[in-house]
């Protein structure tokens, strides 16, 4: 409308933020993002950390080839990854619904979560691998000599030292999932509509300042996460005995 596109506005107002919090469509998509992103992040952190630790071992063959395959989702254009995921998860979804009798809505969430986890794993692998570069492997051997099993060694020796890298990778994975729109449009349905998807629909179907209000909220979330990353980086440097410049 003419009033909607009029600048300068009549006055400062928070009504578009109120529209975001009071509108059912915006809130449904927001909560979908809050459900999907954390679960995808947990999967990414778990698998990515294990992969990084495994690839850090000297006896693993073809480490470069394996690493290239694992980080390929970050390198390959997203539209290509989304197309491949569409065919793969379509077959998987049909199997889960027809053979296992699972609910269609639940299967949709599973597909989106797994797809976002795949996109987040490369970030976790890279950050944890970078942290492991300065890790003294003699600590794990000493723990084994003292009778600690591999699980105890990981949680009591390795994890405290690589924790900043794990959290950094998790934050990158969370941001990737929370801001992703292409893959979820390929493999998701209306029930799994996320916040970026809702913003994309809003840009196509209407011109509303509510979209700008939502974008501002997302920017604030991203800035907060980046500040957390910087604090973790400084903590990691202190643990390694490096003085920040």
Where would I find each of the regions flagged by the language model?
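Short cytosolic juxtamembrane segments of multi-pass membrane proteins
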Residues: 233-245
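The alpha-helix within a helix-turn-helix
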Residues: 143
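Short glycine/proline-centered loop/turn elements that form peptide/ligand docking sites
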Residues: 135-139, 238
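Membrane-water interface segments at the C-terminal ends of transmembrane alpha-helices
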Residues: 1-5, 18-133, 161-177, 186-188, ...
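Glycine/proline-centered hinge or cleavage motifs at structural transition points of membrane proteins
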Residues: 146-147, 160
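Extracytoplasmic catalytic/substrate-binding loops of multi-pass membrane glycan-assembly enzymes
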Residues: 7-14, 191-194
């Amino acid at each position: 409308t003419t009033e909607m596109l009029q600048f300068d506005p009549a006055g400062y107002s928070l009504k578009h933020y109120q529209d975001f919090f009071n509108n059912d469509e915006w809130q449904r998509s927001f909560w979908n993002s809050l459900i999907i992103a954390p679960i995808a992040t947990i999967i990414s952190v778990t698998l990515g950390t294990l992969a990084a630790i495994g690839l850090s071992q000297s006896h693993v063959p073809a480490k470069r080839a394996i690493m290239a395959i694992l980080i390929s989702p970050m390198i390959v254009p997203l539209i290509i990854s989304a197309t491949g995921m569409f065919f793969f998860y379509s077959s998987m979804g049909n199997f889960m619904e027809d053979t296992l009798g699972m609910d269609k809505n639940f299967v949709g969430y599973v597909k989106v979560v797994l797809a976002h986890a795949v996109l987040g794993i490369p970030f976790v692998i890279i950050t944890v691998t970078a942290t492991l570069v300065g890790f003294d492997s003699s600590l794990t051997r000493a723990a084994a000599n003292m009778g600690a099993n591999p699980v105890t060694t990981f949680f009591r020796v390795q994890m405290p030292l690589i924790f900043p890298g794990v959290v950094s990778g998790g934050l990158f994975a969370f941001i990737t999932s929370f801001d992703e729109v292409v893959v979820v449009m390929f493999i998701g349905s209306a029930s799994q509509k996320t916040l970026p998807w809702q913003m994309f629909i809003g840009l196509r179907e209407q011109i509303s300042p509510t979209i700008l209000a939502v974008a501002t909220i997302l920017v604030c979330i991203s800035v907060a996460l980046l500040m957390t990353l910087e604090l973790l980086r400084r903590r990691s440097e202190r643990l390694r005995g490096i003085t920040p410049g």
